[in-house]
Amino acid sequence: MCKGLAGLPASCLRSAKDMKHRLGFLLQKSDSCEHSSSHSKKDKVVTCQRVSQEEVKKWAESLENLINHECGLAAFKAFLKSEYSEENIDFWISCEEYKKIKSPSKLSPKAKKIYNEFISVQATKEVNLDSCTREETSRNMLEPTITCFDEAQKKIFNLMEKDSYRRFLKSRFYLDLTNPSSCGAEKQKGAKSSADCTSLVPQCA
C-alpha cells in the first residue's frame, strides 16, 4: 500500500529533491547553450548579397584574385563541395590561418591537427601530394615552424590552379555571376552594376 511522501525516509526525500534540482539545472543549461549557439552562428555569417561585375571579372584573371576575395572564396568552395573535392581549398585555408598564429606555443598542436587531417596516411581529408613533398612535410612536423606547410600549400595551390579553378570558370557557379540578368543585377544612375549573388554565394564565413 502506498503511504505517500510522508511515509518515505528523510534520506529518500533529500535524494529525490536533489535529483529534481539537477535535472532542472541541466535543462536550463541545454536551452541556454542552444540559444547561445544560434546567436553565435548568426554573428559569424556574412551574406554576400552584392558583388560588382568588375570584381567578378577579376576572379577570372587568377586563382589568387578569386580566393583572396571573401565572396570569391565562398563561391569556389561551394563549387568544390558540389564536386565532393573541397579538401584542397580547406587545406589551403588551414595553412593561411596557421601562418597567422603569433604564439609559438600554439604552432605545434595546430600543425599536428593540420597534418593529421590533410597529409597523414590516415588523414580524413587527404590532399593529393607527391611523395617527396609529403615526406618533407612529415619531417617538418618534428619541429613545426610557421613555414612548415609552405611547400605543400604551394603544390596544392598549383594543383587547384591547373584543374579545379579552370572548371570553376566554366561552371554555373561563376558564369551565372558574370551574367547580370541571371543574378538580379541592378543599375543605378552613376553607379556600377552589381549582382545579387545570395542564391549562388549564400554565405561568406
Curated annotation (Swiss-Prot):
Mind naming one GO cellular-component term on file for this protein? protein-containing complex
A Pfam family hit: RGS
Q: InterPro entries, from UniProt?
A: RGS, RGS_RGS4, RGS_sf, RGS_subdom1/3, RGS_subdomain_2
Instruction: Kindly give the Gene3D superfamilies that the UniProt entry links to this protein.
Output: 1.10.196.10, Regulator of G-protein Signalling 4, domain 2
A GO molecular-function term, please? protein kinase binding
Q: Summarize what the UniProt record says about post-translational modification.
A: Either Cys-2 or Cys-12 or both are palmitoylated.
Report the residue ranges that make up the RGS domain in this protein. 62-178
GO BP annotations of the record are: dorsal root ganglion development; negative regulation of cell growth involved in cardiac muscle cell development; negative regulation of dopamine receptor signaling pathway; negative regulation of G protein-coupled receptor signaling pathway; negative regulation of glycine import across plasma membrane; negative regulation of potassium ion transmembrane transport; positive regulation of excitatory postsynaptic potential; positive regulation of heart rate
User: Quick one: where's the S-palmitoyl cysteine lipidation?
Assistant: 2, 12, 95
| Keyword line | Lipoprotein, Palmitate, Phosphoprotein, Signal transduction inhibitor
Which PANTHER family does the UniProt record give? REGULATOR OF G PROTEIN SIGNALING (PTHR10845), REGULATOR OF G-PROTEIN SIGNALING 4 (PTHR10845:SF184)
Q: What name goes with this protein?
A: Regulator of G-protein signaling 4
The organism is Rattus norvegicus
